[in-house]
From Swiss-Prot:
Annotated transmembrane regions: none
Organism: Pseudomonas sp. (strain M1)
Protein name per UniProt: Glutathione S-transferase
Source organism phylogeny: Bacteria, Pseudomonadati, Pseudomonadota, Gammaproteobacteria, Pseudomonadales
The organism's place on the tree of life at top rank: Bacteria
GO MF annotation: an example: glutathione transferase activity
Length: 15
């Protein structure tokens, strides 16, 4: 679950 959140967080930060 943490991995999924981290992935989404990175995507948001990139955007």
């Amino acid at each position: 679950m943490l991995l999924v959140i981290g992935s989404k967080n990175l995507s948001s930060t990139n955007m």
